[in-house]
Amino acid sequence: MNPLVYFSSSSQNTHRFVEKLELPAIRIPIAGTREKLRVEQPYILLVPSYGGGSPVGAVPIQVIRFLNDPHNRSLIRGVIAAGNTNFGDAYCLAGKIISQKCQVPYLYRFELLGTAEDVVNVRKGVTEFWQRQN
């Protein structure tokens, strides 16, 4: 199965969610590494939303840099977003922004660490998505 590519800050919320999925996954580095992540196969991006509800800063800068590489951007096939419902209309805004800019489906969204139901839904949805692609 193709991997998830994900970003998680030092809070590790997104990382903990990805671990529960038990799916192949590659993490976009937080910082401090000179080597850029370059993917070699199609992937689904899993991204948290930041910025406190503002479109400015909603997508983590590390994710922007990753997607600014034309090779990486050419392999994205879908996006899943984590967010906080306290942000109102900006809940999971990073997923909406990336879906629109990269013209890929916005597959799922979940709050903070996600629930057991979110884990089941994402695992099933990702598996079915790749089956339809092949």
From Swiss-Prot:
Pfam families: Flavodoxin_NdrI. GO terms for biological process: protein modification process. Gene3D superfamilies: 3.40.50.360. SUPFAM superfamilies: Flavoproteins. One of its GO terms (molecular function) is FMN binding. It comes from the Bacteria. Probably involved in ribonucleotide reductase function. Belongs to the NrdI family. This is Protein NrdI. The gene is nrdI.
